């Protein structure tokens, strides 16, 4: 059983990391249904926080489909930015500025370089779409940060 079986996927890519279309392309061979994909500039938003529009969309999809049916994928270039995005969709907006302030959705959230994502998609497509960025990103730091956030705030640890 894949992480994506029967799941609705929200993609928040990064202009300086892994863009949304690259992540979406990797998902084409899975049972995932991409309901939203965006590519942001994480360093452009306030202190690397998740864009307010994206927070609103995540909240709306959680209301529409149920938090248990969602997976959020991020492509942030840095562990800190990835962690902020992950914290926002699990524990709520840490800046207390957006629609997810105080909203603990506990969503499943992964970075595109994590093994949970990488192992669930076609390796040739992954190498073509993400392989080059994987070589320049600090993958170990990103994995550690994402795992820490999931362990602290994730409600769906399957």
From Swiss-Prot:
It catalyses: acetyl phosphate + [thioredoxin]-disulfide + NH4(+) + H2O = [thioredoxin]-dithiol + glycine + phosphate + H(+); acetyl phosphate + methylamine + [thioredoxin]-disulfide + H2O = sarcosine + [thioredoxin]-dithiol + phosphate + H(+); acetyl phosphate + trimethylamine + [thioredoxin]-disulfide + H2O = glycine betaine + [thioredoxin]-dithiol + phosphate + H(+). GO terms for cellular component: glycine reductase complex. InterPro entries: GRDA (IPR006812). Pfam families: GRDA (PF04723). The keyword Oxidoreductase applies. Its EC number is 1.21.4.2, 1.21.4.3, 1.21.4.4. GO terms for molecular function: betaine reductase activity; glycine reductase activity; sarcosine reductase activity. The active site is at 44. Monomer. Component of the glycine, sarcosine and betaine reductase complexes, together with components B and C. In the first step of glycine, betaine and sarcosine reductases, the substrate is bound to component PB via a Schiff base intermediate. Then the PB-activated substrate is nucleophilically attacked by the selenol anion of component PA to transform it to a carboxymethylated selenoether and the respective amine. By action of component PC, acetyl phosphate is formed, leaving component PA in its oxidized state. Finally component PA becomes reduced by the thioredoxin system to start a new catalytic cycle of reductive deamination. NCBIfam families: reduct_selen_A. This is Glycine/sarcosine/betaine reductase complex component A1. It comes from Peptoclostridium acidaminophilum (Eubacterium acidaminophilum). The lineage of its organism: Bacteria, Bacillati, Bacillota, Clostridia, Peptostreptococcales.
């Amino acid at each position: 059983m894949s992480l994506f079986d029967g799941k609705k996927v929200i993609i928040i890519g990064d202009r300086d990391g892994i863009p949304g279309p690259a992540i979406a392309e990797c998902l084409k061979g899975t049972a995932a249904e991409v309901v939203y994909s965006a590519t942001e500039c994480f360093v452009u938003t306030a202190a690397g926080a998740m864009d307010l529009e994206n927070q609103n969309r995540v909240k709306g999809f959680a209301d529409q489909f149920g938090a248990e049916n969602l997976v959020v994928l991020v492509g942030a270039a840095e562990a800190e930015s990835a962690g902020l995005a992950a914290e926002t969709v699990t524990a709520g907006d840490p800046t207390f500025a957006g629609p997810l302030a105080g909203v603990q959705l506990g969503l499943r959230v992964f970075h595109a370089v994590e093994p949970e994502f990488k192992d669930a998609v076609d390796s040739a497509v992954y190498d073509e779409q993400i392989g080059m960025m994987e070589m320049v990103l600090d993958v170990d730091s990103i994995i550690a940060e994402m795992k820490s956030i999931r362990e602290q705030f994730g409600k769906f640890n399957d």
